[in-house]
Amino acid sequence: MASPPESDGFSDVRKVGYLRKPKSMHKRFFVLRAASETGDPARLEYYENEKKWRHKSSAPKRSIPLESCFNINKRADSKNKHLVALYTRDEHFAIAADSEAEQDSWYQALLQLHNRAKGHHDGAAALGAGGGGGSCSGSSGLGEAGEDLSYGDVPPGPAFKEVWQVILKPKGLGQTKNLIGIYRLCLTSKTISFVKLNSEAAAVVLQLMNIRRCGHSENFFFIEVGRSAVTGPGEFWMQVDDSVVAQNMHETILEAMRAMSDEFRPRSKSQSSSNCSNPISVPLRRHHLNNPPPSQVGLTRRSRTESITATSPASMVGGKPGSFRVRASSDGEGTMSRPASVDGSPVSPSTNRTHAHRHRGSARLHPPLNHSRSIPMPASRCSPSATSPVSLSSSSTSGHGSTSDCLFPRRSSASVSGSPSDGGFISSDEYGSSPCDFRSSFRSVTPDSLGHTPPARGEEELSNYICMGGKGPSTLTAPNGHYILSRGGNGHRYTPGTGLGTSPALAGDEASSAADLDNRFRKRTHSAGTSPTITHQKTPSQSSVASIEEYTEMMPAYPPGGGSGGRLPGHRHSAFVPTHSYPEEGLEMHPLERRGGHHRPDSSTLHTDDGYMPMSPGVAPVPSSRKGSGDYMPMSPKSVSAPQQIINPIRRHPQRVDPNGYMMMSPSGGCSPDIGGGPSSSSSSTVPSGSSYGKLWTKGVGAHNSQVLLHPKPPVESSGGKLLPCTGDYMNMSPVGDSNTSSPSDCYYGPEDPQHKPVLSYYSLPRSFKHTQRPGEPEEGARHQHLRLSTSSGRLLYAATADDSSSSTSSDSLGGGYCGARLEPSLPHPHHQVLQPHLPRKVDTAAQTNSRLARPTRLSLGDPKASTLPRAREQQQQQQQQQQQQQQQQQPLLHPPEPKSPGEYVNIEFGSDQPGYLSGPVASRSSPSVRCPSQLQPAPREEETGTEEYMKMDLGPGRRAAWQESTGVEMGRLGPAPPGAASICRPTRAVPSSRGDYMTMQMSCPRQSYVDTSPIAPVSYADMRTGIAAEEVSLPRATMAAAASSSAASASPTGPQGAAELAAHSSLLGGAQGPGGMSAFTRVNLSPNRNQSAKVIRADPQGCRRRHSSETFSSTPSATRVGNTVPFGAGAAIGGSGGSSSSSEDVKRHSSASFENVWLRPGELGGAPKEPAQLCGAAGGLENGLNYIDLDLVKDFKQRPQECTPQPQPPPPPPPHQPLGSSESSSTRRSSEDLSAYASISFQKQPEDLQ
């Protein structure tokens, strides 16, 4: 480089030398001239060679005034590693040096003259001459204008760290925002601006904090911004000269982002050289106690234009100190903000930041604006876009300070808790892209929100959660029982007078908050309006303790039984603090006593706020004196006033509640808290009036006549103490074997409300539970003679006495009972008498049948909906029954067709055919029809067509042939039955010949062979009926009812081979003990107050398979205890070839049985033979894959010890898969028999078989 000549003509030359043009790589002679006294501006000229310049033979090839450059930068590309680029308004001019030293010397010389051209005098030149760090932003542009505003020319715009000329491509935001073409990408310490060629104002100013990621590919560079950017989320794609430039842009921008992150730590950008930045991380804030936040000082909103000071940088250099900006766009490194003592190195803004800030802050900062600027941004935006009204408006709306204005709207932390005069204060929101701290971010935008938006303080993070435990009302609690935060987070404790989130700093807000309970939760925590100063008084230990307190107390704010039931109408229900709505919440916990020993006021006077919506249908919670206001449907088995016991399970019968407060759901029975409750059971009398439970609560044994559950809900309970259908949608799922507290059938809702539809819990059952009334079964007979889901178990509103607490869901064991039970005066339990007024009602209308809960009589696997539960009756069968009703003038019994099931279940129906079936006018009627419930006359049942894969064993007393004769329906007998084999027909059962795969094995006394022998096509299933003709037609109904309640219905299927043996052993079908003592369950104790319920027995032809426990049903013992226990295993009973019933005394486990020990417990006839009776007839069914037996155990009440089992006559097993067309109709058949569409083995006791 030639030395500048000393002659007068070259006095203004500062530097000369040969440099290359980047594109052509031609060397040219460049001359750098300073501003001359003659008025020539500082400029860079080049000549073709030095000779021409020295001889002045020609004008310079090109002259570039430095004042027209808005930026000068070092550059490098793939061809030239040492470039110096001058960016003017309309072009990009670069020179290439041969070495880095040469590049730097030229760069510094250009930078110095450029700064002078911007208005500096020689005295201030030292400011910009000191550091050439690769960026001229510190010493160029408007930054120094504040130091000396005498220069009259307006520089083109703010200086930038880096400037690249790019071509924005029509992709992403470039297309949507119409940013296409040649732009300059101008980088400052905090922003990136796109300045269109030949324009002074930035089209878009993006904060570095708005950049999600950036990267380059080949000669393309892209920037992805988030939704906090003024442009919204998207990408900018730009093309540059080559990949080197793109890489340089990527690295430089990434470095700027990293530097900003390191300095202010608002978020951590990508710390590696990857092409994307890290996601935003919320920083902790530095609190400066000496400077109150704007929430206390007051925030006067200043317009963004004020912070920009003008629409053009000219105003910043206009020489008016009064227009000094709180943070100029070049705040910290511009001419205005940089003190003369600072070297102005563009690469060391952070070192100058504190000094510059303190230098100007005290002297020239406007006090009202004091809160607005907490950080002097060392390289804050200085883009020409300072004048862009678009960027202003967008920044003001976005709250992220995306304009060239250095007021970052997001940097609200300064206004929140920062010290504006503290240069070292770090505002995490300074960069405004932290998406999670909108509370403070918008504060600078909307100062009026200061009173309502909690300052975001890192120390307060522990206390930013609302206390989830509502304390009981006490000296520390609000009127509605919410916590009074023991830790104030702000160092003060809340009192009921001050709403949550209020603080001394917000006294005005306090009043309204205290007035309205909703305001208690309007703010998330106390910190919502609290002054940071108070907050700072809180030690970290306070925060941690507070957080622990608020998290550990998750318990209700009331004593378990305390408080009036309903929610206070005056108080809104807080969504945060529940009262007891769940059993475990009702446990006796006293958080306040535990916490501070404070006494809670009388719980009865407390108004607890139940935060839960009542789930019961159509029932509004009513304030009452109930001990809890739980709105949940109790799932416990049975509760006499159980709502209270469930809410506070510990109070009564804690043994019924597990440690978590849940009601025990075990099938062993007695789950409900009211077990053992007698007529005087206090629980039955303490039903909360405000209970919104839809509960199946019935009173314990004897409680019927003593107490009526009082429910405020209109149709909750009838006078009988039974809940009315509207009371609940839930059904008690626990099979309570200990049914001494079972209540009368809730199906029968009492005289005042007989027509109620079944309780909604009925509709929540599987179809299999939607039982229909059994034909010909009187209500009492149904209740006493058929095992059913008892209301005692809370499962279904079935007619169930204490005896009928069987929770067996076996289809036929469930079936056969009327909802309304008629009790005889002879019934042992006094509570039965309560139902007597209701008993006489007839079940003669379809409406009643529909309104009552029909009970299933089958367990079928065919239905995917309830594979383990009995199927509900189908509508089509209802229609068929209605048609049959019309034909036979009988009450239509709606029995949907039995499912086509693979035959996985045994239908064990425990009922006893009583002589009462034939008693009274029923015996005299020619057609069996249920005219009154008192007459135990089975209604006709129409057999469905289709193959049935079930074997039904109907164990019940046989009916007289007269019945079948009276029905006039031909009874088909399968094959040649042995002489005397009595096929006991089902009452008026029209069996279509297409019924196929069905074989009735009628095992009855020879005398009872009144079955019509019309041969039908061979069936693959055996209808095995061991008929025991019930001759005791004249038995009094009282006796019958009593026997029914005490009868144990369990039968061991006996094959035709063992018919004689079975007949010989009265112990099998009710021996000397009286009422049938047969039990198909584990050690059924036949006690008078217990019934038996059926269990599913699987008979696997290939072998005994044990059924899943879900297919077993708990049994309730029957009345009489039988001495002989006959292990009745399905394997033994109907395994492979047939069933074996042995009356062995031993306890034997049969794996094929779906329960542990299936006991056939006949009468205590010690001489009962042990030999198994082979059920040959079952083989036909087994051939067809019959796995289960449907046992219809119809019990005969008046079984005398001398009575012996009928001699079953085994019909020959028919070929499998062949329909049984026997249209057998006997009105004497039990309704359970009526509903069995698959092979039924009826063990019926014939009166002739009495011994």
Swiss-Prot record:
Q: Where is the composition biased (Polar residues)?
A: 924-937, 1111-1123
**Mediates interaction with PHIP: annotated segments:** 3-137
Basic residues: compositionally biased ranges: 354-363
All copies of domain PH, residue ranges: 12-115
Q: Which PROSITE patterns match?
A: IRS_PTB, PH_DOMAIN
| Record PANTHER family | INSULIN RECEPTOR SUBSTRATE, INSULIN RECEPTOR SUBSTRATE 1
Record protein name field: Insulin receptor substrate 1
